[in-house]
Amino acid sequence: PDNPFATDATKFALLSLAAGEWLVRHADDQAVLHLHDWHAGLLALLRERLPSFERLKHLRCVLTLHNLALQGLRPRRGHPSSFERWFPELDPDDPLLSDPRYADVANPLAAAIRSVDHINTVSPTNAREILQPTDHARGFHGGEGLEVLLQNAAADGRLHGILNGCDYTAIPQHRPTFSDLTDTVAATLTEWSDQQPHNRSLFTLASRSLNQARHKQPSIILTAVSRLTDQKAGLLLARTQGITLLQQLLRSLPSDAVLLLLGSGDPGIETALAQHAATDPRLVFLRGFSEPLANAVFAAGDLFLMPSTFEPCGISQMYAMRAGQPCLVHAVGGLNDTVKDNINGFSFSGPNPEAQVANCMASMIHAQQVFFDQPERWQEIVDEARAARFLWSDAAAQYEAKMYV
């Protein structure tokens, strides 16, 4: 518990070994070995280096990258959670393990990128982004130190971008009324308050703000459903001229607007959002997650906010669009591949964080102008969002054609 990265790495090293040993016994029944992220990356190396895993070499081995920022870095030797301790029969200085930045580190993800037959990330835009180096000064998330390896893979025809799909078997048929939504929120807050008495004051604040809004239909309902991490909320809390982007967004709204934000995660981000909610009742911060509540929020909102700093694919924007709620997004990764500015939603970009904040605000003001002043145009955008389809059958066909054959 005091060393979670080491503990997790050891667990996944054991998982790779155990999965490989099982596959050796059942290799004739398999055609493709599909690995995901660093957690399974060592299996690609074991397939190459362990004599007992020789039978696995006839299997096509492919890798999907969901989050390149997490790479499972561990010492090569000299630590209980090191490559030498996990696999004493193998060379801890194996070049397949080399990290492009740190000489004494074993990088499971780098080993997999070097070893597998094909690699994909979960959107075409992200597959292009990761070929460039990450530049935090520009607010750009790219190859996270592995861009040269990925450039080599792309040059070899081994790197692909395949957009994730969305389930369309349960499309909301009707938009809930605001009264229906507030009833769902109120019931959820009561349940959470009973389960988490230490957070009761936060839930009471959300209930109070909600009660102020429920007496009449808000002029516009903004929504967000998210894990609260720097990736998801960092731009909202970025400060320019002494105030956050979230404060700017709230100030741009009519007095009878509502922003429902559902999510939990980083305690510092939770605290910051609670402080914003305490000073502006238009923000209803729902700390936690409930799938029925999330579905109600997706179905009942007018505009869904997703200004992620990076987003390999994203799924929340697909859920919102499926329900007929246009999205305002940062045009990165899968958000760029799913939300088309002024067609089925709104998007922004910028060469640095300051420009991204300014352009997000400009996009927000534009979206409100369309919503309030051009109702027919807004309905066209709603219809385009609802009609968009990102099918798993299409993704599966691409996996078969590009990765498995």
Q: Which sequence ranges carry the predicted segments?
A:
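Catalytic cores of nucleotide-sugar-dependent glycosyltransferases that transfer UDP/GDP/TDP-activated
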Residues: 1-405
